[in-house]
Amino acid sequence: MVAGRAGSERMGDIMRVRIHDVSLHVAVLAGCLLFGSRAGAAEPDWKAVEQALGKPGQVQAGDVFRVGMPRTDLSVNVKGVPVKAGFALGSYAAFRQVGDRAMVMGDLVLLDQEVPGVMSGLFSGGLEVTAVHNHLNEMSPHVMYMHYEGHGDAVQLARALRQALAASATPLGAPAAAATGGAPAIDAKQIEQALGRAGRDLGNGVFQVTVPRAEAITENGMPLLPAMGIATVLNFQALDGGRAAITGDFVLIDREVNPVARALRQHGIDVTAIHNHGLLDTPRLFYMHFWAVDSPATLGQGLKAALDQTNSQR
């Protein structure tokens, strides 16, 4: 019996060694395949994407290539306040290459009559529509926002997007020269002090503060990065008399929605929309849009109170 047990133990040792060897070979093979797929993946040709879409873009954090397409052709008022394209009318496309495929996602600013044609164009090009809704209320003319997503070759995605946009009057080609003078100046220091965060001057009296979330956001295991539109955006537009208008959106998870809305209302800021922008984000995200007019410091304090209710990067 003792000899039998010893033989069994030796056989067990041999089997464990063989299993370990097989596991090691599998791990090495998987690593080689992964390295090979990364090494073999072509670097994205963003110049070709620019040519296909007809607009220049910029590489941003996380190797996201973002193309802005502001609706500079529109003259829109919100509650009688003329809004700048960089403040509330900014269509965009955010591309990110992963292996041999690219992902694009973004938001298109459209007049009501442009929505059906652009949507059909996106479908014809193999892209998906993930949301259509308003961001603000009392807009004249009325404007809708269409969110979309696509996967495949980056240049083909850009061509498909351009074809869809042909059903709208979205300006493509080289951006028009920015108008100089005339726009009230905005007190950026007041805003940054009230929020406790740095921002950036977008020009033409518009100032922006972007606040990423603290946790990782994914879609089907793929990271969704702040430059892809997955960050809270706080936009300020200078008005006469030292005042400012604010709009933008908070990126929230479910339990933050009501605390943020309550904080905004307590500070006199209107909540104008609560909805989703995507279909498969994890954790599930909700976007809260807002509007108010007041001094930059007062507005910043209200937005800070709302930000304090979120799991945002500090």
Residue ranges and their predicted role:
Residues 25-36:
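Bacterial N-terminal signal peptides
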Residues 2-14:
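Short, Lys/Arg-enriched N-terminal segments with co-localized hydrophobic residues
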Residues 37-41:
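Sec/Tat signal peptide C-region and signal peptidase I cleavage site
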Residues 42-142, 149-285, 289-314:
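Long, contiguous binding/interaction regions
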Residues 13-27:
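Bacterial N-terminal signal peptides that target proteins for export
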